[in-house]
Amino acid sequence: MSHASIIASSEFFSAASPAVIDAIAASAQEKSLVRGDVLFKEGDAPDALYIVLSGRIAIAIDNKPLDSRESVVALMVEGNLFGDLALLDGGARSALARALEPSTVLRIPYSAVEPQLSNTPDLLCGITRVLARRLRAMDEALADSVFLDVTGRTAKRLLELSEGKDEFVLPVTQEELAGMVGA
């Protein structure tokens, strides 16, 4: 699949014209990662967004300096886009992104996207949908942390990870699952 078709299939760029997609794709580069590789850390200066081509990427917030635990706030799989928040507000990275297994991502420099935001207001529609979905997910996670105990949060997350199947292979380690549910 070409970089342009990968970018076009992302809801983030759903309102972009083929010409805009091609302009963005011209600057995109694939990056291979091994388990444990960190794409960026919380506080880093941002310069790109990413689309997962293969593997899994954890988006996590750590609890330092209190202890070495981290909370996995999102699990990015094939087709997911991440690293976009700083594109919109210019702030530093708000979390870290780490490969959970051998992975490949498509790196899209902000410098390729920013001019398109000014020239293509429709592009903001797809971005707004993505951000609204993430905000709803964070609202739900906050409610879960308040109203469900660890057992309830674990059961709910396992149901989500099963994708409705009766039998499935758990795609995360016990430690990663604990980070996802705040245990």
Task: Indicate residue ranges for each PLM-predicted region.
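Cyclic-nucleotide recognition modules
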Residues: 72-132, 136
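Cyclic nucleotide-binding regulatory module and flanking cytosolic helices
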Residues: 1-35, 86-88, 119
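Polybasic "coupling" helices that flank or enter modular domains
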Residues: 100, 118-183
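Short loop/turn microsegments at loop-to-beta-strand junctions
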Residues: 28, 46-48, 168
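Short, solvent-exposed loop/turn segments that connect beta-strands within catalytic domains
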Residues: 64-70
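Short phosphate-coordinating micro-motif centered on Lys-Gly-acidic
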Residues: 39-44
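Glycine- and acidic-residue-biased ligand/ion/polar-headgroup-sensing regions
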Residues: 36, 47-62, 78-79
